[in-house]
Design a protein with these regions (language model features):
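Bacterial Sec-dependent N-terminal signal peptides
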Residues: 1-27
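GH16 jelly-roll
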Residues: 23-265
Length: 265
């Protein structure tokens, strides 16, 4: 058997194994959740995301107008900034993360969310290594559970690493997929972080598997480590494009976040 055929067989077997893990909910035990039923954000777990220079972070704001607890959901908003003297960003967006506070020790992470569409809107749910000091980006990887652009009826599910970015091995194996969503309703976005693969799913249906493979190239699968979770609304950027302020405000409703671990056999 040739090496290419052997590698293909291994990847296929991993995908089948991962698919079974993703589809069988009985294999998982709920170990933590936040259902956002309180009167405010639980700051023992969450913080507001920091403003930064990257496209995803350059409108992040602690402005209370970007946050609301409503109907058992946390609502993250994107708004027009009407006071450029106090903040030079033309738009302000809400975002939260568990950085430095709460680690997700692999397993299954799911988020139930409803996303409003708007031109230039870019809501995201994603994971980065909890140990930021020893896992500088992209060496520790990035797991994008959900990104949605504008009024799209699909979500992007992606992973990044030193292997895919620096070594440009983003198709060996493929590193992302798109999955259909209910654009005006709640959807459950999830990923299983397993020793041998990442398994993405939407509404309980497996959408994509990224396997660990045998390779002499470094950094192919750094993901099986504790992670922190980011949930943020963003407006504008080179990927999503220009914002139409007439379509604002725009909202991202978070119903719950759940973390599962495999049941012991």
């Amino acid at each position: 058997m040739s090496n290419s055929k052997h590698s293909s067989t291994i990847i296929t077997l991993l995908c089948i194994t991962s698919m079974l893990c993703a589809c069988s909910r009985s294999n998982w035990k709920l170990v933590w959740q936040d259902d956002f039923n309180g009167s405010g954000i639980d700051y023992t777990v969450w913080s507001h995301t920091d403003r930064g220079n990257a496209d995803w972070a350059n409108t992040q704001s602690k402005d209370p107008r970007c946050y609301e607890m409503r109907g058992g959901c946390l609502v993250l908003k994107g708004i027009v900034n009407d006071n450029l003297e106090s903040d030079t960003a033309h738009y302000l967006t809400g975002g939260i993360w568990t950085k430095g506070k709460h680690a997700f020790d692999c397993g299954r992470i799911e988020v139930r969310a409803r996303l409003q569409g708007a031109k230039g809107a870019w809501p995201a749910i994603w994971l980065l290594p909890f140990d930021t000091e020893n896992n500088r980006w992209p060496n520790g990887g990035e797991i994008d559970i959900m990104e949605r652009l504008n009024h799209d009826t699909i979500a992007y599910q992606t992973m990044h690493s030193y292997y895919t970015l620096n070594l440009k091995q983003d198709n060996n194996p493929p590193h992302y997929t798109t999955a259909p969503i209910k654009p005006n309703d709640f959807n459950v976005y999830g990923v299983d972080i397993l020793p041998d693969s990442l398994v993405f799913h939407v509404n309980g249906k497996r959408t994509f598997t990224y396997p660990r493979i045998n390779t002499d190239k470094p950094g192919q699968f750094p993901f099986y480590i504790p992670q922190y979770l980011l949930i943020d609304m963003q407006l504008g950027g080179s990927w999503v494009g220009a914002v139409d302020p007439s379509q604002l405000p725009v909202e991202m409703e978070i119903d719950w976040v759940k973390h599962y671990q495999p049941r012991k056999k």
